[in-house]
């Protein structure tokens, strides 16, 4: 970049054919070769933007005049003949990235979690009456399935408690110390405390073991009966109460009911996000129902490089598919309440323009048939507030992800169908790949922060369960369309990435349990809050169970048994060991844990195993996945225990992973994360081997899994092993045998997007003419003229230019990007005075040129 010919260098950066670039050079007088103001005036001549003169405050704002011209050079096809362009009140070019706002009121009710306060308010007549919305016919239909659901859930409760009671009784007979009834606390009060401790300690440990066993077995039993009923449901193939059976699947969509596909994102893989979005858009277009749908990308990204990359990817998507005016993009400057706040902001601004909205995750892909089916289900079921599809996991290559894909694809349908069997229209909502009726969502599903202070107060983290509970509290159904195909997602590529996600989910589920006693919640959703907590609380309970069992073994081995527990006891109380009962109970527990997996494979065999690699390979894959789950279960147990304890103590668990180019876990990170588990496993194994080698065999699956945890974590994160399994047709899923066109398109567009990806987005927005024009046109801080604002702008620009680029913080970069004036002034200064800002120029010249033309 030469000071004396900066304008000529600038023209070289414009995406112009050689002939047009030459015409522009000849148009400039030689005296203006180093004058950016003259150049941008020349660029803007003849542009329609001349009708709206930019309110230029100084020569520094010269680049604002040519924003429209530069946009038309780079993305003319995506501007819909200029219809996508507009101006703000100061005449500055602005892209119409979002439709006109039509505001709706959305405010939350205050949480009343204290039942005594609610009782007192009801005495004072302050209760809020229910808000009915059903016709008499609809009420009859709902009462029918609600009665069936209630009966089914009572059956589940009886089965679970009965099974738990029998297992707990067996466990009681297995434990060695059986003299609890002979202990007399009054007698113990008169003897030395050490003797009392020696007598009581084994029985206290046994009591703790028994209580924990009952809780954990009940949890396992509930999962077993859920999977069993799902197996029967899928095997029969008929479900009278399936919501999918309420339409024939080819009804025309009501043109009065429009649907918004909204994708909240935050610092995601930009190339993958927009590849999946394009595949989904084109699939909807192929159904012939595109006019019923709009797409919204709602960004909460706070990485300036990613923000600029998102803007470029959005513009390219609109250009490639002709989606101008139908695909919208918004980046929030004030990130309130995370994902739920992002969705709430959409509902307040544009929600009342739509009857339904489909929530997509950043990795979601949905077929047009699935989306139109969800809309038809909403129209056929006017009492439904949320209909959740059952997303299938696919698209990953690491060994860890392939094991998880296989598990969710083979076992997942049983549990999902089982959940539907027990819950019917009072079901789960998982926060994505689901359709929501917008009006009741706006009226009833705004989330107030949890009252109080501490780690369990403030904005709700896991919003999906709470929104489903509020929707049901308002009288609307929440359904799972478990048999609806065409819904896809991706899983974390390795164990550590999954655990990062689990840390957030753990905290969110623990917070949600504060709503267990909130007024009006349906009992099923209270149970959902409980199961959400148990998903993570079961880990510390299991760990405590193992610790107490180990402590009991230590006491049994090292302490002399107390045979006489009363002063005049005639016969001693002998510790006993009944191995036949222990083996029977252990076998029963294994059956509850692994029979659902075997039933899943039987179901695959019954319906055809070809898409899973064949009958034999499915069985081998089952054994591999079972081995893998056994190795990972103790590792997850310890991590989840740390997450739960940290949440209760208010500790902030920092998890900063090193940057890596692929999904593989480096050895250094593996030993940092799993080192304490390895040491615990070694100490535990050595201690038990010294104490009683027989007990070590019972603990072997636990301790050896901990010892091997770093190695399992590293090797399972490698794509080479996963691809080797794929070549051997192991851990196969139908989406690999016969890939849906949406997933094939996603992979294709992902490769295309990687070829034209934008790295170092902020620097490109400062220097590159096309990217700068895009950033300026999409900047949202569009203030009217004010001297105070001008002073702040000047200070921000000056502070940035007086530093090296790497010294400008992300927050400062975001402020500069958000204002069309500041980002344009940066662009002007670095091109007008390259020798003054040599540090910026040198940093930019090291970067590859951005890909503008497809």
Swiss-Prot record:
EC number, as in UniProt: 2.4.1.-
Pathway note: Glycan metabolism; osmoregulated periplasmic glucan (OPG) biosynthesis
CC terms in the record's Gene Ontology section: plasma membrane
Locations listed in the record: Cell inner membrane
GO terms assigned for molecular function: hexosyltransferase activity
Membrane-related topology note: Multi-pass membrane protein
Residue ranges crossing the lipid bilayer per the database entry: 155-175, 209-229, 528-548, 583-603, 619-639, 671-691, 695-715
Keyword Cell membrane: yes
Recorded superkingdom: Bacteria
InterPro entries assigned: Glucans_biosynth_gluTrFase_H (IPR023725), Glyco_trans_2-like (IPR001173), Glycosyltr_2/OpgH_subfam (IPR050321), Nucleotide-diphossugar_trans (IPR029044)
EC category name: transferase
UniProt cross-references to CDD domains, sorted A to Z: Glucan_BSP_MdoH (cd04191)
GO biological process terms on file: glucan biosynthetic process
Gene3D superfamilies, A to Z: Spore Coat Polysaccharide Biosynthesis Protein SpsA, Chain A (3.90.550.10)
Keywords: Cell inner membrane, Cell membrane, Glycosyltransferase, Membrane, Transferase, Transmembrane, Transmembrane helix
SUPFAM superfamilies listed in its UniProt record: Nucleotide-diphospho-sugar transferases (SSF53448)
UniProt record similarity statement: Belongs to the glycosyltransferase 2 family. OpgH subfamily.
NCBIfam families referenced in this protein's UniProt entry, alphabetically: PRK05454.1-1 (NF003955), PRK05454.2-1 (NF003958), PRK05454.2-5 (NF003962)
Record function comment: Involved in the biosynthesis of osmoregulated periplasmic glucans (OPGs).
Protein's UniProt name: Glucans biosynthesis glucosyltransferase H
Organism, as annotated: Pectobacterium carotovorum subsp. carotovorum (strain PC1)
Underlying gene: mdoH
């Amino acid at each position: 970049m030469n000071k004396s010919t900066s304008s000529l260098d600038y023209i070289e950066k414009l995406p112009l054919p050689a002939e047009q670039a030459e015409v522009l050079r000849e148009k400039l007088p030689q005296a203006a070769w180093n004058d950016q103001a003259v150049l941008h005036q020349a660029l803007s001549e003849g542009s329609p933007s001349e009708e709206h003169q930019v309110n230029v405050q100084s020569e520094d704002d010269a680049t604002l005049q040519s924003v429209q011209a530069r946009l038309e050079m780079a993305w003319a096809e995506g501007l819909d003949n200029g219809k996508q362009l507009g101006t703000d009140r100061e005449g500055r070019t602005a892209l119409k990235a979002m439709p006109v706002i039509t505001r709706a009121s959305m405010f939350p009710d205050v949480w009343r979690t204290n039942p005594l306060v609610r009782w007192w308010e009801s005495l004072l007549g302050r209760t809020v009456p229910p808000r009915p919305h059903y016709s008499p016919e609809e009420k009859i239909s709902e009462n029918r399935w609600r009665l069936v659901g209630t009966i089914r859930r009572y059956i589940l409760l009886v089965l679970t408690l009965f099974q738990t009671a029998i297992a707990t009784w067996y466990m009681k007979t297995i434990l060695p110390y059986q003299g609890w009834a002979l202990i007399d606390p009054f007698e113990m009060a008169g003897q030395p405390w050490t003797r009392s401790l020696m007598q009581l300690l084994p029985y206290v440990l046994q009591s703790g073991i028994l209580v924990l066993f009952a809780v954990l077995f009940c949890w396992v039993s509930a999962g077993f009966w859920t999977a069993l009923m799902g197996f029967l449901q899928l095997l029969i193939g008929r479900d009278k109460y399936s919501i999918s059976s309420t339409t024939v699947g080819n009804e025309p969509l009501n043109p009065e009911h429009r649907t918004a596909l909204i994708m909240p994102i935050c610092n995601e893989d930009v190339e993958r996000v927009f590849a999946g979005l394009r595949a989904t858009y084109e699939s909807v277009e192929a159904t012939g129902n595109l006019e019923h749908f709009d797409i919204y990308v709602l960004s909460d990204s706070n990485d300036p490089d990613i923000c600029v990359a998102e803007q470029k990817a959005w513009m390219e998507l609109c250009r490639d598919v002709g989606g101008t005016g139908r695909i919208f993009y918004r980046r929030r400057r004030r990130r309130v309440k995370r994902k739920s706040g992002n969705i709430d902001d959409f509902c307040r601004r544009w929600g009342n323009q739509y009857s339904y909205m489909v929530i997509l995750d950043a990795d979601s892909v949905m077929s047009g048939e699935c989306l139109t089916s969800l809309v038809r289900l909403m129209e056929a079921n006017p009492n439904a507030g949320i209909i959740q599809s059952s997303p299938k996991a696919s698209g990953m290559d690491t060994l860890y992800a392939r094991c998880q894909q296989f598990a969710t694809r083979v076992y997942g349908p049983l549990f999902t169908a089982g959940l539907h069997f027990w819950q019917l229209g009072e079901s789960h909502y998982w926060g994505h790949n689901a359709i929501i009726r917008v009006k009741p969502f706006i009226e009833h599903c705004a989330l107030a922060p949890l009252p109080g202070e501490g780690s369990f107060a403030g904005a709700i983290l896991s919003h999906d369960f709470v929104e489903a509970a509020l929707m049901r509290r308002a009288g609307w159904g929440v359904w799972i369309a478990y048999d609806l195909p065409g819904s896809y997602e991706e899983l974390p590529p390795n164990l550590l990435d999954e655990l990062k996600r689990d840390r957030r989910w753990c905290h969110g589920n623990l917070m949600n349990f504060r709503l267990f006693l909130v007024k009006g919640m349906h009992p099923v959703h209270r149970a959902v809050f409980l199961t959400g907590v148990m998903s993570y609380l079961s880990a510390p309970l299991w760990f405590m169970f193992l610790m107490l069992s180990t402590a009991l073994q230590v006491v049994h081995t090292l302490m002399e048994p107390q045979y006489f527990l009363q002063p005049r006891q005639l016969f001693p109380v002998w510790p006993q060991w009944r191995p036949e009962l222990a083996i029977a109970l252990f076998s029963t527990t294994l059956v509850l844990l692994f029979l659902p997996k075997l039933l899943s494979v039987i179901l695959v065999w019954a319906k055809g195993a070809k898409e899973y690699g064949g009958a034999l390979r499915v069985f081998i894959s089952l054994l591999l996945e079972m081995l893998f789950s056994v190795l990972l279960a103790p590792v997850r147990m310890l991590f989840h225990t740390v997450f739960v304890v940290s949440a209760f103590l208010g500790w902030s668990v920092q998890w900063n992973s090193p940057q890596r180019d692929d999904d593989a876990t480096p050895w250094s990170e593996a030993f940092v994360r799993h080192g304490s588990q390895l040491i615990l496993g070694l100490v535990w194994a050595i201690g038990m081997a010294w104490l009683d080698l027989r007990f070590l065999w019972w603990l072997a699956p636990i301790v050896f899994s901990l010892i091997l945890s770093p190695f399992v974590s590293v090797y399972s994160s490698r794509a080479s092993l996963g691809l080797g399994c794929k070549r051997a047709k192991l851990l196969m899923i139908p989406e690999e045998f016969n890939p849906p066109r949406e997933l094939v398109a996603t992979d294709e567009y992902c490769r295309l997007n990687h070829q034209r990806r934008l790295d170092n987005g902020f620097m490109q927005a400062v220097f590159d003419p096309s990217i700068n024009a895009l950033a300026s046109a999409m900047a949202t801080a569009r203030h009217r003229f004010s001297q105070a604002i001008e002073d702040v702008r000047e200070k921000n620009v000056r502070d940035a230019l007086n530093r090296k680029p790497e010294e400008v913080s992300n927050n400062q970069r975001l402020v500069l990007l958000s204002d069309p004036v500041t980002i344009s002034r940066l662009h002007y200064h670095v091109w007008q005075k390259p020798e003054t800002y040599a540090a910026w120029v040198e940093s930019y010249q090291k970067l590859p040129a951005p890909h503008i033309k497809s």
